[in-house]
Amino acid sequence: MTPLFRKAVWLLFAVSVCAFAGSLAAQYVLGMEPCVLCISQRLCVLATALCAAIVLMCRPRRKAGGLFGAVFISIPAVTGISVAAYQLWLQSLPPGTAPSCGAPWTFRLKGWPLFDWFEPVVRGFGNCAEPDYLLGVALPVWSVAYFLAVALTVWWAWARAK
């Protein structure tokens, strides 16, 4: 792994941890109630941080290892982009016509062995069709920008490292 690629992955890890902490702060400090899709995006941010940490711990030495790292980090980023884009589409529909965004995560994971520990991360019963704003911009737009920045950064660093 080249120094540039390693620094980029460290940056992505740090930004992902901050974004995850920010999503928890928005819920528990600012009082924003996340919906199922918001929580899915939160889990994609967490997965991005975990993937970056795994790439940093594995320290791939060959170019193929760097390619693996870029693909590995891109998977949750692309998933997050698709979830946020779906939520933006839901929010663009006329009021009352948006379909349900699914069962709450707390219901889906109730029987999971680590549920009591993980429950604060997946708790939320907000409406996916009602937008929340940060600095005048809808939160799914911020999510798309974050995930797009992750994907572009990791592929830029990989291309520069070749």
Swiss-Prot record:
Keyword Transmembrane among record annotations: yes
One Gene Ontology term of the molecular function aspect: protein-disulfide reductase activity
Lineage: superkingdom: Bacteria
Key words, A-Z: Cell inner membrane, Cell membrane, Chaperone, Disulfide bond, Electron transport, Membrane, Oxidoreductase, Redox-active center, Transmembrane, Transmembrane helix, Transport
Membrane topology designation: Multi-pass membrane protein
Keyword Nucleotidyltransferase appears in the UniProt entry: no
InterPro entries listed in its UniProt record: DiS_bond_form_DsbB/BdbC, Disulphide_bond_form_DsbB, DsbB, DsbB-like_sf
Subcellular locations according to the entry: Cell inner membrane
Cross-referenced Pfam families: DsbB
Cysteines joined through disulfide linkages: 35-38, 101-128
Transmembrane segments: 9-25, 44-60, 68-85, 142-160
Cytoplasmic face of the membrane: 1-8, 61-67, 161-162
A biological process term (GO) from this entry: protein folding
GO cellular component: plasma membrane
Periplasmic domain ranges by topology: 26-43, 86-141
UniProt family annotation: Belongs to the DsbB family.
PANTHER family (alphabetical): DISULFIDE BOND FORMATION PROTEIN B
UniProt function note: Required for disulfide bond formation in some periplasmic proteins. Acts by oxidizing the DsbA protein.
Protein known as: Disulfide bond formation protein B
Organism: Neisseria meningitidis serogroup A / serotype 4A (strain DSM 15465 / Z2491)
Organism lineage: Bacteria, Pseudomonadati, Pseudomonadota, Betaproteobacteria, Neisseriales
